[in-house]
C-alpha cells in the first residue's frame, strides 16, 4: 500500500501541530515543530488568512496524517461513522483509535504509529492468541494483544517500553508491561483522544 515518503517533521510543521510521527524524538527538544513552529519553505513564516474550506481541509489532513491513513481509506472511515448511531465525528475518532496499529502504539509496544504498522505487518503480535499482520483491524472490548514470545527481546520493543513511561496509557486500555500484553477494557471515548482535533470541521468538510 502507498504511504507518505515526505520527511515526517516537515509534515508536522506544515500542519501546524505535533503529530508524533517520529517516536521518541517528538518527546525531546530535537522536535522540529518545537524548534521551528512555522511551515517549511521560503515563505513558511508568513501566515496567510485561510478560508473556511481551507481550515476544514487542514483539519482533515492533519488527522489522517497523524493516523497514517490515505485519503480513500479515511473517506471510508467517515462514511461508516456517518452511518452509525451517535455523533459522527466521535464515531470517526473512535474507529481510528481502535485500529490495531494505533492500539499497539497506545499500549506502548511501538514508539510511533508508523512503527506499529510495520511491526504488525512483520507479524510481531498476536490478537487473542492468533498471529496478525493487518494494521487496520478494528479491536473490540475484551481483545488481548501480545508481543510474540520470539520477539519480546527485540530492541525496538524494549525501546518503546521506555517511551510509554513518558506517554502514559489511555483509560480504555490495560497493559501488563512485564508480560508485554495489553487488553481492550472499554471503547475509546472522545476524551481518550489526547490530541487537539476538531472533528466537527471534518464532518462539515465531508458534508458539503
UniProtKB/Swiss-Prot annotation:
Any matching Pfam family: S4
Gene Ontology biological process: ribosomal small subunit biogenesis; translation
InterPro entries recorded: Ribosomal_uS4, Ribosomal_uS4_bac-type, Ribosomal_uS4_CS, Ribosomal_uS4_N, S4_RNA-bd, S4_RNA-bd_sf
rRNA-binding in keyword set: yes
Gene Ontology terms, MF aspect: rRNA binding; structural constituent of ribosome
GO cellular component terms, A-Z: small ribosomal subunit
Statement: the UniProt record of this protein carries the keyword Cell membrane: no
Assigned keywords, A-Z: Ribonucleoprotein, Ribosomal protein, RNA-binding, rRNA-binding
PROSITE patterns the record matches: RIBOSOMAL_S4, S4
Every S4 RNA-binding domain range: 98-161
Record CDD domains: S4
HAMAP family in the record: Ribosomal_uS4_B (MF_01306_B)
Complexes and interactors: Part of the 30S ribosomal subunit. Contacts protein S5. The interaction surface between S4 and S5 is involved in control of translational fidelity.
Family: Belongs to the universal ribosomal protein uS4 family.
Function of the protein: One of the primary rRNA binding proteins, it binds directly to 16S rRNA where it nucleates assembly of the body of the 30S subunit.
PANTHER family assigned: 30S 40S RIBOSOMAL PROTEIN (PTHR11831), SMALL RIBOSOMAL SUBUNIT PROTEIN US4M (PTHR11831:SF4)
The protein's name in its UniProt record: Small ribosomal subunit protein uS4
Name of the encoding gene: rpsD
